[in-house]
């Protein structure tokens, strides 16, 4: 043993096998230091190399060995301690203790859930206008139920996307299961959904209602009832949800709780005697919310003994698990190994794992009727398109006896853009990234597209301009991909003289002015019913903005002494043209906007093209109203001129509405001074050289192509 310890290579590579002959040392006679630890501190170098940086370090380690042997000789063999075994034991116990809390947590949650009957389940969501405090209230509820540990770092716990934390808004409806011990001493299983507040993500809110029996209608105590508050109330009311009014931010100096309660009674005819007054920031009054939920929200209806009937609510992609499904069980149970059948696709799957969001994924042995949880299959879904939201799953063999649940209404895109990779070599990787995002956001429509200027790409449909912007941010943050996106445009409907209809979402497909059929066709554009809430002193300016946007006023109501609700019928194209930004600017940020589809209206529309040396740039074309042609045409040519480099010949940039040129800019060519070498020659020689240069430029312009870098398109299309 002594010889082995004296070898440098053994010191540098300590033996990890415990010595069976050496028994455990009593605490009173253990060494003051660990031989193994000392050996591990030596450099890990091969025996053929210099293992020590200096002679001093070598002498120091030799002294350590000498002290070790002295201590060992002073002990009897029955008292010797194996030096490596405790190290291994500590290492293994550390790994076990890091895993055991998670396993114990899952087992403890499973036991508590198994003891809760369906009558003590409550599924509810939080709905409100944007920035009224939904995510902050969710954090306080998670702390109150012990789902997460209380602390200052709990901010937007359920907002898991980078774009949500960056912008401070909720984009995806997020779910969480909570176990709450009520005042009667009984456990209740609560399922919470934190929904988005912006109108562009209303499809998320609508899907969330399918898994809930009630909702917290949250209102800011200083802002009062606003546009999305009204819209979300009527959505929840139409779904038959039980509503619990909650007034938030009561700790603010500008809070006016009596005014807000009066608004709730006047606008929604709600009984405000049961309203809960809270401050989600400080936690004041949060403890009264869950008892109100238990008292006012009914338990879900279901039977765990019946065959499985499961609704697909949401889906996302995981690198290791594949397609993960968020499901709501109406009947039956679901566990690992079960075989399920999809009504939408007819495919059969084997369940690989089930679990709940607590708030992160916690595996469970079984999901029961009334619960909301996640599931993924093993083997997984072959195609992302197989995960159809609103699909019903049941046990294999029960598809003939189980009636599928009504699915979701497909959201209709309001805004269309063309998207192209900045580098065509990245097309394949970008296609996979977009497919993964579309799996998680089913309100996006996707079609392949091609542009002569920008190459292969896609035609994407969104619910609004913010929806489009968030999608672009998610693509960059989650997948590291950047794309060129054209200006948002709304669809156009063409009814030919024969009565046939054509919906055009790509301006490149709009008929040319040479097509004789377009002269006798009727054109329609989409309209929306917009609801604007604003303070009374800004009414005049907002009416002017809506009138300039070709809006038609429907009503003007005072729902308090100082707050006004304006209802307008507006073209959807005005929303793309930053109508909301204009309203916010005119009201110092107090205006709020909500809208819903109002169908088609006849309009005078024309295709606006950007021409470079009389050749159309298809990626920039738009279908606009005739009243906007002059303004947009002038903006286009002025902006595009800034980003196109000078050429050896003259470049003419024009905006054309049909056959009519509405604006023009010219980029002068580089000019060579052909007269520099003539000095004092006669005028005829000078004129001859100038005419020769002019003829050469004319030939170059006839055969030359304008080279436009893709960065020019990127800068032109950016706001």
From Swiss-Prot:
Transit peptide: first to last position:
1-75
What is the catalytic activity of this protein? Answer: GTP + H2O = GDP + phosphate + H(+)
Q: Coiled-coil stretches, from where to where?
A: none
Q: Which Pfam families match?
A: EFG_C, GTP_EFTU, GTP_EFTU_D2, LepA_C
Entry EC no(s):
3.6.5.-
GO BP annotations listed:
positive regulation of translation; translation
Q: Which keywords does UniProt give here?
A: GTP-binding, Hydrolase, Membrane, Mitochondrion, Mitochondrion inner membrane, Nucleotide-binding, Protein biosynthesis, Transit peptide
Give residue ranges for domain tr-type G: 119-301
Ligand binding (GTP): 128-135, 194-198, 248-251
Topological category with respect to the lipid bilayer: Peripheral membrane protein
UniProt xrefs under SUPFAM superfamilies: EF-G C-terminal domain-like, P-loop containing nucleoside triphosphate hydrolases
Instruction: Please state what class of enzyme this protein is.
Output: hydrolase
Q: What InterPro entries is this protein classified in?
A: EF-4, EFG_III/V, EFG_V-like, EFTu-like_2, G_TR_CS, LepA_C_sf, LepA_CTD, LepA_IV
- Which PROSITE patterns does this UniProt record tie to the protein? G_TR_1, G_TR_2
What GO cellular component entries does it have? mitochondrial inner membrane; mitochondrial matrix; mitochondrion
For molecular function, the Gene Ontology terms on record are: GTP binding; GTPase activity; mitochondrial ribosome binding
Q: Where in the cell is it found?
A: Mitochondrion inner membrane
Under the heading NCBIfam families, the entry gives: lepA, small_GTP
**Functional description taken from the UniProt entry:** Promotes mitochondrial protein synthesis. May act as a fidelity factor of the translation reaction, by catalyzing a one-codon backward translocation of tRNAs on improperly translocated ribosomes. Binds to mitochondrial ribosomes in a GTP-dependent manner.
Q: What is this protein called?
A: Translation factor guf1, mitochondrial
């Amino acid at each position: 043993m002594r010889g082995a310890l004296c070898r440098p290579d053994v010191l540098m590579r300590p033996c990890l096998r415990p010595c069976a002959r050496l028994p455990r040392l009593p605490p009173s006679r253990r060494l003051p230091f660990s031989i193994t630890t000392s050996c591990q501190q030596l450099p890990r170098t091969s025996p053929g190399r210099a293992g020590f940086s200096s002679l001093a370090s070598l002498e120091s380690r030799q002294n350590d060995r000498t002290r070790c042997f002295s201590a060992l000789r002073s002990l009897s063999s029955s008292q010797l301690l194996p030096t490596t075994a405790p190290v291994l034991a500590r290492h293994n116990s550390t790994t076990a203790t890091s895993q055991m809390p998670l396993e114990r947590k899952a087992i403890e949650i499973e036991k508590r859930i198994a003891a809760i009957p369906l009558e003590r389940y409550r599924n509810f969501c939080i709905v409100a206008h944007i920035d009224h405090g939904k995510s902050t209230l969710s954090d306080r509820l998670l702390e109150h139920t012990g789902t997460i540990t209380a602390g200052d770092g709990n901010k937007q716990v359920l907002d898991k996307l980078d774009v949500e934390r960056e912008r401070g808004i909720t984009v995806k409806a997020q779910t969480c299961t909570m176990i709450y011990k009520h005042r009667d001493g009984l456990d209740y299983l609560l399922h919470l959904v934190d929904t988005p507040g912006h109108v562009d993500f209303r499809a998320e809110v609508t899907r969330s209602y399918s898994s809930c029996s009630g909702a917290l209608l949250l209102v800011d105590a200083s802002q009062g009832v606003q546009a999305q508050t009204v819209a979300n109330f009527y959505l929840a009311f139409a779904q038959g949800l039980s509503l619990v009014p909650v007034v938030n931010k009561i700790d603010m100096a500008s809070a006016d709780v009596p005014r807000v309660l009066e608004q709730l009674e006047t606008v929604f005819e709600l009984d405000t005697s049961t309203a809960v007054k809270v401050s989600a920031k400080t936690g004041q009054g949060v403890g009264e919310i869950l008892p109100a939920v238990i008292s006012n929200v009914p338990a879900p209806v279901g039977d765990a003994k019946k065959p499985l009937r499961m609704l697909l609510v949401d889906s996302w992609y995981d690198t290791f698990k594949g397609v993960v499904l968020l499901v709501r069980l109406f009947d039956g149970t679901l566990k690992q190994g079960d075989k399920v059948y999809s009504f939408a696709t007819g495919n059969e799957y084997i369940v690989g794992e089930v679990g709940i969001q607590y708030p992160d994924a916690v595996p469970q042995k079984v999901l029961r009727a009334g619960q909301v949880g996640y599931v993924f299959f093993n083997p997984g879904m072959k195609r992302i398109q197989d995960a159809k939201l609103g699909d019903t799953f049941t046990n294999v063999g029960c598809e003939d006896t189980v009636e599928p649940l009504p699915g979701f209404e497909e959201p209709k895109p309001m805004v269309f853009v063309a998207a192209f990779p900045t580098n065509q070599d990245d097309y394949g990787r970008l296609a996979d990234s977009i497919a993964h995002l579309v799996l998680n956001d089913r309100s996006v429509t996707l079609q392949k597209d091609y542009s002569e200027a920008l190459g292969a790409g896609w035609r994407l449909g969104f619910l609004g301009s913010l929806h489009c912007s968030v999608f672009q941010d998610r693509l960059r943050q989650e997948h590291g991909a950047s794309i060129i996106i054209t200006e948002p445009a709304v669809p156009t409907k063409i009814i030919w003289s024969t009565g046939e209809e054509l919906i055009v979402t790509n301006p490149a497909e709009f008929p040319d002015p040479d097509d004789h059929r377009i002269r006798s066709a009727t054109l329609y554009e989409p309209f929306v019913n917009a609801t604007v809430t604003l303070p009374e002193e800004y009414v005049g300016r907002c009416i002017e903005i809506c009138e300039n946007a070709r809006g038609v006023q429907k009503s003007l109501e005072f729902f308090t002494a100082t707050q006004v609700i304006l209802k307008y019928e507006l073209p959807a194209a005005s929303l793309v043209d930053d109508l909301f930004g204009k309203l916010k600017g005119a009201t110092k940020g107090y205006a709020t906007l909500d809208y819903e589809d109002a169908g088609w209206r006849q309009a005078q529309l024309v295709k606006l093209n950007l021409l470079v040396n009389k050749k159309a740039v298809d990626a920039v074309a738009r279908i606009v109203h005739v009243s906007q042609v002059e303004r947009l045409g002038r903006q286009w040519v002025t902006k595009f001129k800034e980003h196109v480099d000078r050429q050896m010949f003259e470049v003419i940039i024009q905006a054309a509405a049909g056959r009519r040129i509405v604006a023009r800019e010219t980029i002068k060519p580089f000019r060579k001074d052909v007269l520099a070498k003539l000095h004092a020659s006669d005028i005829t020689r000078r004129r001859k050289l100038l005419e020769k240069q002019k003829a050469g430029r004319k030939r170059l312009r006839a055969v030359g192509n304008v080279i436009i870098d893709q960065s020019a398109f990127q800068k032109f299309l950016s706001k």
